[in-house]
């Protein structure tokens, strides 16, 4: 789906929520052998002209390097999401929610971030459990009047894709 954004060199601004903590005391962690920030580092290489932003609830894994800035966010608290966008601005080509894999947190991301996605940009919610399909069908029916929505079934989960019109 990322490949259909546009030419990868034209992508200028990407956000990933959920950097992949390896702190087993943090909900929705990758386990102690996980590598925090691996995906945003891959985005930095893939989208060679983009500024990459990341956000996570685990303050211990936040970092900054060339073209990458990371910030604290609690997806269950819409005020921290709103505060994140005050810091990082708008006009995102791609926002990926790979953080807390819970519908309430995912919906908070949609409510706070969709307005910051560029026209023809994408907001992607990853790792949706099969049992939550009905929730995302409702979300899709609400959003589909203004945006193109797709619920993609993979072997392990669903992925919800919003293309902003």
Walk through the language-model features, giving the residues of each.
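A short alpha-helical cap/connector motif
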Residues: 1-96, 100-125, 129-165
């Amino acid at each position: 789906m990322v490949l259909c954004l546009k030419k990868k060199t034209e992508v200028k601004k990407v956000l990933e929520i959920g950097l992949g903590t390896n702190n087993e005391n943090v909900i929705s962690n990758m386990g102690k052998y996980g590598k925090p920030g691996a995906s945003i580092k891959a985005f930095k290489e893939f989208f060679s002209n983009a500024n990459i932003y990341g956000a996570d609830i685990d303050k211990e894994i936040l970092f900054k390097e060339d073209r990458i800035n990371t910030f604290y966010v609690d997806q269950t608290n819409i005020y921290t999401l709103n505060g994140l966008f005050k810091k990082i601005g708008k006009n995102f080509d791609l926002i990926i929610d790979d953080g807390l894999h819970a519908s309430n947190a995912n919906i908070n991301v949609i409510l706070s971030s969709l307005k910051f996605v560029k026209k023809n940009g994408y907001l992607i919610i990853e790792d949706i459990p099969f049992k939550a399909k009905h929730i995302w069908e409702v979300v899709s029916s609400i959003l589909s009047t203004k945006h193109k929505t797709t619920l993609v079934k993979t072997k392990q989960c669903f992925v919800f894709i919003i293309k902003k019109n």
